[in-house]
């Protein structure tokens, strides 16, 4: 026992609820409510720049894979369950994550850690012909590294929009939902290929919450 107060907590328990996978749960995560503020329909990708950035960011800033199954069956995920859920959502939006991932050349990457609470990947994007930094992680952490929030057709200061995001997060938390925040930043060619340095500038653009 690392913390003694845990013993007191365990001693106060009177009922333990357990579950066998397949009865209450399915050992599967799925995207419930994507909320990307820059999309006209926050839950659906379209044929615009923001949609392309979202799709490329989810594809490249991930280490999970989907394995093909029998005809008519849903692809099987391999890797982090949260990332698998995001790839399955992309698949439902008719986006080929593998083509997007293979097309975006990775220049630098920060894998997720419990200390940082985010993952970041810098790629050379063939979609826009520039370097792009993608980041996903705990929404409050990701938002704190952003200068602006991308809305439909405009940008707002992230400080002004923070209360709106926090209210949405509280709603998701009350429904026992796990949430992720997404952000990006266009990077000039003369800037270093260093995720740590780029993220620390707190100059990202917040895309939304899933």
Stretch-by-stretch model annotation:
Residues 1-210:
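Conserved cytosolic headpiece of P-type ATPases
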């Amino acid at each position: 026992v690392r913390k003694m107060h845990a013993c007191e907590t365990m001693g106060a328990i009177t009922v333990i609820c357990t579950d066998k996978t397949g009865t209450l749960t399915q050992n599967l995560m799925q995207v419930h409510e994507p909320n990307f503020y820059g999309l006209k329909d926050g839950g659906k990708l379209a044929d615009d720049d923001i949609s392309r950035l979202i799709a490329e960011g989810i594809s490249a800033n991930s280490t999970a894979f989907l394995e093909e199954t029998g005809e008519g069956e849903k692809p099987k995920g391999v890797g982090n369950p949260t990332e698998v859920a995001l790839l399955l959502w992309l698949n439902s939006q008719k986006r080929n994550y593998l083509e997007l991932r293979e097309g975006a050349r990775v220049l630098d990457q920060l894998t997720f850690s419990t200390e940082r609470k985010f993952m970041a990947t810098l790629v050379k994007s063939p979609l826009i012909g520039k370097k792009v930094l993608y980041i996903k992680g705990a929404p409050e952490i990701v938002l704190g590294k952003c200068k602006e929030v991308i809305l439909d057709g405009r940008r707002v200061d992230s400080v002004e929009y923070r209360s709106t995001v926090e209210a949405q997060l509280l709603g998701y938390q009350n429904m026992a939902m796990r949430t992720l925040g997404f952000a990006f930043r266009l990077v000039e060619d003369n800037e270093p290929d260093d995720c740590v340095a780029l993220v620390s500038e707190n100059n990202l653009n917040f895309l939304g919450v899933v």
